[in-house]
Amino acid sequence: MCHLLLSTLLIVLWAQTLPINGCIDGERRALISFKGRIIDPANRLSSWEGRNCCKWQGVECHNITGRVVKLNLRNTNDDDSALNGEISPSLLQLRDLMYLDLSSNDFATSVPSFLGSLKNLQYLNLSRTYIFGTIPQHLGNLSNLKYLDLGNMKSEAIYADNLNWLMHLKSLKYLDMSFVDLMDVSNWLAAVNKLPSLEQLLLGVSGITIRSNSLPHINFTSLKVLDLNSGIALNTLPLWLWNLTDLAHLDLSYCSFKGLIPHELGNLRSLNTVLLRDNDFKGIFPKALNPLCNLTNLDLSYIGFSGEVAMWTKELPSCNRNILNVLKLSGNNLNGSLFGWLEKMTELVSVDVSYNSLTGVVPIGVWKLPMLTKLDLSNNLFEGVISEVELSYMKKLKELGLSANNLTVRVPKDWTPTFNLLVIKLGSCRLRREFPSWIKSFTELTYLDLSNNAISDKLPSWFWNTFHNLQNLDLSNNQIQGRLPVLLQFMALSNLNLSFNQFEGPLAPLPESLTSLDLANNFFSGSLQIPNPLLNIYTLRLSNNNIVGTIPISICKSPYLSLLDLSNNNISGEVPACLGRSQALQILDLGSNNLLGHIPDSLCSTGMPLVIRTSNNHFDGPFPSFLKQCTTLMILDLRQNKFLGILPDWIGESLTNITILNLRNNMFSGSILTQLGQLQYLQVLDLSHNNLSGSIPLLANFSKLSSKELEFNDDFLSYEMSGYYMYYMVLVTKSEELQFSKTSLLVESIDLSANNFMGEIPEFFGKLFKLQNLNLSENHFTGKIPSNLGNMKSLESLDLSMNDLFGEIPQTLSKLTSLSYLNMSYNNFSGKIPTGDQLQTLNDPTIYIGNPYLCGPPLPIACFSNSTHSYHSDNENEGGLLSVEWLWMYIGLLLGFVIGFWVVCGSLLLNRSWRYAYFNMTDNLFGRFNVTIALLLAKLCRKK
C-alpha cells in the first residue's frame, strides 16, 4: 500500500514539472536570446512570439517532455531571406536538441566551439553559410552525431588542421566537407577508416591528396556514396577503393588520375553512378564497365580517350543498355557517327557528346528517343539540315545543343513547338537573317545561344519582356542592330554577350544580377556612366566602341570585378585611384585610349593581377614602382606611352611569372641589367624604340625560350578559352606589324631594335631554341655573327640590319629550316653569301643591300675564286688593309698622274724654243682677250 502511495506521489510531482503551455520556459528564453542576435531581413522569425515556443516556425518539441529537439532554420528561399548575425551560445540551454540546421544563411562567424557541448545532437548542418576559420576539435564530443554537413561554404576560408576529432564520431553516417580546405590534413583517410557506420562521404574540392596506397584493414565498407572530385591524385586509382563493394555512387572527377581504368572497377557491382570526368586516362573504352549492370549514370567526359565511338559503346554493360539514363562522353577525341548505337538506348534521359570529332547526319532515331530531355551535340562535325520535323519528335526535350557543327537549322517563322525548352544552343547553325520568332514559345528559357549566325535583323520588341527567367544570353558575332532598351534592366540575366554586332547609342540600365557583360566591338557611344551599379559583375568588356569621357568612380563599387577591358575607345582623363584597390581584379586592359597621368599605385597591394595593358595612351613618369608587388603578373604591356628613366633591377627579381613584357615606343634609357635574365617564363620581350644603350648582358636564364615544351598559366588560359578575354599582342616581325590574338601564348620573340645597344651579339641567343623572332636592327652592334645562331631551330624571322657588324655571314644560318624572313642590310659584311637549304629560298637581293664587300647570289656581284673579301672596322685594326683590286687601282691613278705631268711640264723645262713659243702664245691670247673686253665695254657705254 505504501509503495502504491509513493508511486502516485512521484507521478503527481513529475506531472507538475511538465510545461503547461507545451514549452520549457528556460528554453523559450534561450530561443528569444538566440533571435536577439540575429538579423532577419525577411522577418522569417515573426512567429517567435507567445509562450508556446513549440509552435514557432522551425522549432519542434518532444511530445511528452516538451523540450526542444529540433531547430530547422534552413533558408529555402533566395539570398534576401538569409539570416545573418551571430550564433548565440544560448542554444546550450536546449539540452535535448537532436537536430540543428542553419544552412543556406549568411552567418559570418567561425564554427562555434560550444556546439560540441550539445551531447544529444544527431544532425548538424551548417553548409552554404559564410562560416570561416578552423573547424573546432570540440565537434569530436558529439558521439551521437549521425549527420554532419559543413560543405559548400560561401566563404573560402574554412579549413581543418587535422581530422583526429572525426575518429570519435562512431555513429556518423553522412559527412560532407566539400570545399573545406583540407590540404594540410594528411590523415583524412585514417580518420575516415575509423567510421564503421559511414554511408556517404563527400570531400569534393577540398584539396585532399589521394594516394594510391592500400590500407591494412578497411572499416568503412558500408560506404554507398563517395565524392572525392577535384582531389590531388598522386598516381593511379587507390587500391582500397575496390573493397567498397556496397558503393553505389562514385565521383572521382577532376582528379588527374593517369593510366588505364583498372579492371577491378567491375567488382563494384552495386555502382549506379560513375563520374570520372577530367582525368588523364588512356587507352580504349574500359571493359571494366561491362559487369556494372546497375549503371544508370556514366560520365567519361574529358578523359583523353579516342577512337571509334561505336566501338566504345560495345563495351557498355550489355545487361543494362536499356536502363542507362545519363551518358556523357564530351571533350574526347571520338570519331565516327551516331548510327547503330545511340538510337537503341531507349531509356536515355540525357546525352552529351559535345566537343568531339563525330561526323555524319544525326539519325532520325535519335530524335525519336522517348525519354530524352537533354541532347548536346555541340562542337562536332555533324552535317545536314535540322527542321521542325526532327524537333517535333522530342516531346520531353528541355535542353538542345547543336552549336559549332556543319548543321543548318531551318524552321518556319510560324512554327509552334510542342515542347518547352529551357536551354537552346544554336550557335553557327546557319539560321535565317531574320531573328527566329519561333523561340518566342519558350517562355521558361534560361540559356539562349544564337551566336555567329549572320542575323542582320533588329531584336523584336517581344524579346525583352518574354524571357523573364533568361540567365545566359549570347547573340555575339551577328549583325544585329538597334539600341539597348530600358526593359533590359528588369531581366534576370547573369551572362550577357552582345559583342561583334552593330548595336549603337548610349549604355542602358543593366540588370543588377549580371556577373558577365560583353558589349565589345559595337558602336556604343556616350559616356561610361552606367546608370545602376553592377555589384555582382565579374567580367566587364566594352572594348572597340566609341565610348568617351572618363572612367567613373562607380566602377570601383563592383567588389568581384576580375576582368575590366575598356580598350580601343576614346576614354580620357586619369584612372581612378580606387580602381587599384579592387581585390579581385586580375585583368586590366585600358589600351588604345587617351588616358594620362599615372597607373594607380595601389593596383597590386590587395589583388593579384595577371594582365596589365595600358598601351597606346599618354601615361608618363618612371617605370611604375608598384609593379614590384605584382608577383603574379603574367602580361605587362606598356607599349607606346611616355614612360622614361632606367629599368629597375627588381623586374627580374619580382616579376617572376611574367610571360609577355612589352615596353616598345617609350623613352626608357640606361642599360639592360643582368637580373632581367631571371624571367624564366618570358616568351616575348619587346624593348624596341627606346633610348637603351650599352651591351647585352648574359640572359641565359630565359628557360622558357630554350625549353622543348610550353607551359601556360591555367588562370589566364581559363579566361582565353572561355572567351571572356582575348589578349591582342602587337609585334613587329618579318618587317610587318602583326597582331596576335589566340596564338599570343604560342609566340616567342625578342625585339631590341631602334636603340643604342653596342658590343657584340651575345652567343646565348643561339641557345634560345624556341625563339621565333629576333630583331636587333637599328643599333650599333659590332663584331661577327655568332655561328651558334644556326641552332635556333624555331627561328622564323631574323633582322640584324643597320648595325656595324662585319665579317663573313656564317654558313650555319643555312640550318635555320623555319626561317622565312632575313634582313642583313646596311652592315659591313664581306665575303661570299652562304647558300644551301633554307637560304636558297631567300633570294631577294635587298636582304643584303648596303654591304659593299658581299658577293654571290642573290647579289649580281660574282665572287673571284680563291679570293676572300674582308673588312675590319677601325675599332679592330686602325688604318685597315685594302683589297688587291683597290690597291692596283690607286697605283694606276698615281702613275698616270706622274706620267702626264712630266710629258707636258718636262718638255717645257727641257726645250727652250718650245718654252718661248708656249709663253708667247699665251701672251697673245691674253692680249686679244683684253682688247675684246674693252671694245664690249665701250659699246655698252654708248648705248646708255
Ranges and model annotations:
Residues 1-944:
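Plant-biased, solvent-exposed loop and capping regions
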